Regions:
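Two-component/phosphorelay signaling modules centered on CheY-like receiver
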Residues: 22-41
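Conserved Asp/Asn-Gly motif in the active-site loop of CheY-like receiver
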Residues: 43-47
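Active-site beta3 strand of CheY-like receiver
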Residues: 56-62, 66
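A Lys-centered signature of the CheY-like receiver
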Residues: 116
Length: 137
């Protein structure tokens, strides 16, 4: 893969998953890692998302919309306010919408939404659609 990513031209895209549901976060990470196309990292406590993102340097962030300590929009606002992370695409995932609603282009605070749980193909499709390498023409 010779696409341009934040971490270098030959490195796999990095995806940060922020979700207080450790089972869902782990399954998404394992799925992305096992594809061989991505490097994924999970954060279970959303209050650690900014710190982890600064060190992990993601190319894409997947954030649960509703979490008890901080919700997805709060996490997104922190990431967007950080000069090193500003511009990194953020996608929310939630069980509050259906796959059909997500495909209709619904957005929350300007960010795409992925239904939770999503099928493997839905997850991979959304990742590819939102990685900087794949959206630039």
């Amino acid at each position: 893969m010779n696409e341009q990513f934040a971490n270098g031209p030959d490195e796999k895209p990095r995806i940060l998953i922020v979700d207080n549901n450790s089972r869902y976060a782990r399954s998404a990470r394992v799925l992305l890692d096992r594809s061989g196309k991505y490097i994924a990292c999970t954060v279970i406590d959303p209050r650690r998302a900014l710190e982890t993102a600064r060190s992990f340097k993601p190319d894409l962030v997947l954030v649960d919309l509703i979490m008890p300590q901080e919700d997805g929009p709060e996490v997104a606002a922190q990431l967007e306010a950080d000069w090193a992370l500003h511009g990194v695409p953020i996608v929310f995932f939630t069980s509050l919408i259906t796959a059909e609603e997500a495909k209709d282009g619904r957005r929350v605070y300007g960010h795409r939404i992925l239904p939770k749980p999503a099928s493997n193909s839905e997850l991979f499709e959304l990742v590819e659609q939102n990685l900087p390498c794949c959206t630039e023409a």
